[in-house]
Amino acid sequence: MQDEDGYITLNIKPRKQALSSAEPASSWWRVMALVLLISSMGLVVGLVALGIMSVTQQKYLLAEKENLSATLQQLAKKFCQELIRQSEIKTKSTFEHKCSPCATKWRYHGDSCYGFFRRNLTWEESKQYCTEQNATLVKTASQSTLDYIAERITSVRWIGLSRQNSKKDWMWEDSSVLRKNGINLSGNTEENMNCAYLHNGKIHPASCKERHYLICERNAGMTRVDQLL
């Protein structure tokens, strides 16, 4: 517009300020986003905690299951061996029960199966024969094992005890040394008597070239619980 002096006057009207409602809306969304973030983090933490608890519980239950299985197996073993023992007393002969994990003609005692073989062999030949049966010559390091074996034999039997020479220690087939305060050898331990046999409940040294019957031993495995009855 032109004024009285001929100058042009600009009539500029101030622009209306933008609605301030956008700013509160933006703040509201930020608050909501923060709430959702915190909630999500809480959910993740909760899920992780549940996962840890679940894994811990699974490990506990697995350990309990293993303990119960071991206890059941021990009870089953004792019961099975008692069934066999009572049957042998009753029949006065070797008895095989279907609960035994041992092969036919092998006897079940403790954690082992014992094979009594009537083969006249040298000690080395006996050792090899047992190896072929996936076994070793018997170890009678405990009195209970010695008594069990002695009650079931009448003839001389090679066992898994030997030494390299008269200056060396007597050792079992598993490389353990014969304990001085444990089972003792009876008779003379002269030179060239570097292998041992069992007879009449006692262990005797002998020449390894002698020929005798033998006893093999191998791990029994698990008692057949489902065959107890």
UniProtKB/Swiss-Prot annotation:
Tissue note: Hematopoietic cells, megakaryocytes and platelets.
Record flagged with keyword Disulfide bond: yes
Glycosylated residues, chain numbering: 67, 120, 134, 184
Residues carrying Phosphotyrosine: 7
Miscellaneous section: Acts as a receptor for the platelet-aggregating snake venom protein rhodocytin. Rhodocytin binding leads to tyrosine phosphorylation and this promotes the binding of spleen tyrosine kinase (Syk) and initiation of downstream tyrosine phosphorylation events and activation of PLC-gamma-2.
Annotated membrane topology: Single-pass type II membrane protein
Any single GO BP term: signal transduction
Protein's cellular compartments: Membrane
Residues in the Cytoplasmic compartment per record: 1-31
Extracellular side: 53-229
Gene of this entry: Clec1b
Official protein name in the record: C-type lectin domain family 1 member B
Disulfide cysteine pairs (residue numbers): 102-113, 130-216, 195-208
Organism of this sequence: Mus musculus (Mouse)
